[in-house]
Each structure stands twice: as C-alpha cells, then as structure tokens.
Amino acid sequence: YHPDVPTYKLLRLGHASWSLVEVAWEDGPYLPENTSTTTLLPAANTGLGINMTLSAIAGVNDDQGWLATDIGRCIRYAEGGSTAFGWAVIVSITSTTVAVADIKVDFNSSPTAQTTFRLGAWSGTTGYPSIGSFYEQRQWAANTSTQPQTLWATQTADFENHTPDKVDTARTIEDDDALDYTISADEVNAIRWLSPGEDTLVIGTTGGEWIPESNGIVITPSDVVIRRRTTLGSANIQPVRVGNIVLFVQ
C-alpha cells in the first residue's frame, strides 16, 4: 500500500517464481452518489472503449470534470433510482467532459443522461489507501490523501471485490457486501495503522485508538460502529502484537 500509487500484490507462482502485479479491484470502492445536476451519458450499455459524457464539470472532481489522473478509476451508473447499477473502468480521457471506459457489468437498456452515477474512491485524483490488513475474512484498507480517516472493507471471503450491493433493481445490501466507514471525531484523525487480533481490529490514528464493533457476531455494512478507546495517538509506525496486547509508538 502507498498513497501515491495503486495497490499491488506479491504472488508466489513457484519455488523461485514471484510476481508483483497491480490489484484489479472489482466494482469499487466508491464515493457517495452524485448529488449535483450534472448528468452522465454512456454511448452504449456494453462493450469496450465506450464514451462516458458529462453534461457539465460541476460536481465532478471539485468542478474540474474528468482528469488524466482518473484513468483506472471505477464508475457506477444506473438508468434511475429503481434500476440496477452497472460499472466500468476509465481507460483514457478525451476532455474534461468525455472519458473512455471499458464496461465490466452492463448498464441497463439503452443508456440516457442520468444523475445517478458514482465515481471510484481510489484513483490518481483522489489518492490510494496507505495501509491495509485482513480481518473477519475481509481485506481492509484505509487512509487516502482525500479521505484520511475512512476505512474500506471488501466483500466477505472475496478479497478484491468491493461491490457495495447486489446487482438488482432493489440494490439490496447483504451482510457479506463490501462496506466503508469514516471515523467521526472533533478533529482529523488520519489512520496510521490497522492491527487485527482474534476478536477485534485496533485502528491507530493520529489522535487516538479506535475499535470497530457490531451488535451481532460479525461486522456487516448495516451493523458497524467505530468507537474511540484511547486518546494517545499513534506514530506512522506499524505496531506489534504480543498476545492480546498491541504495542505501538505514540
């Protein structure tokens, strides 16, 4: 993990065969749905090299429209509030209002200009996660340059899948779907490290240490809250676990 470059994984293919490859995240993670009046119009509902045209630049990348740093970024689009999302990955930028994308899950019917779209949370524009870990059969990541106190978790037992809901007209959210959570505090608490244990995930930030909790047995998209446990604050150094104790540098 590094905030300035996409996430990579190290693969062992044989006794002396190793490969470092970029992670191909599936369907996310995403920023909240567009709230501006700007619409997105795909030139087709399926295929590669499809133009994705904005009606304006307002509401996109701080009113800058498409940027060269959006290449590799995910897009979610739906025909309206009652239809399922499809998603795509930006492969090139033509102008501030036209991006070219490869569609991964088809959009519904014949696309029309709609405000119902979401942009990926991770990109050269928004930054990439600085840290990550595994907990409760999910891959967790945190702290981009634009969202320093946000965590993201993949779908359960699908470590590269950030699909936030089912691909159906109800956009059903199930317990094993991906999730994201932004720590609420009275000041910015950039996440420095994640330390998973047998029954808890400790989150070290610049202003304190936090624990995610749920009312049920496991954390789910609809059952999670992150509470502060201390106000010590953490240095940007990975902690060490000794039994059930987390040793970290302030």
Task: Enumerate the language-model features and the residues they cover.
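Beta-propeller domains
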Residues: 2-6, 26-28, 72, 126, ...
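Short hydrophobic/aromatic-rich beta-strand motifs
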Residues: 1, 70-77, 131-132, 139-141
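Short, surface-exposed terminal/edge motifs of secreted or surface/virion proteins that either
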Residues: 2-22, 99, 148-154, 209, ...
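Short, solvent-exposed secondary-structure boundary motifs
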Residues: 1-2, 74-83, 182-185, 229
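Surface loops and adjacent helix of pleckstrin homology
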Residues: 1, 10, 23, 103-104, ...
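Autoprocessing Asn-cyclization modules and mimics
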Residues: 10-12, 17-115
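Beta-propeller and closely related beta-pinwheel folds
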Residues: 115-138, 142-250
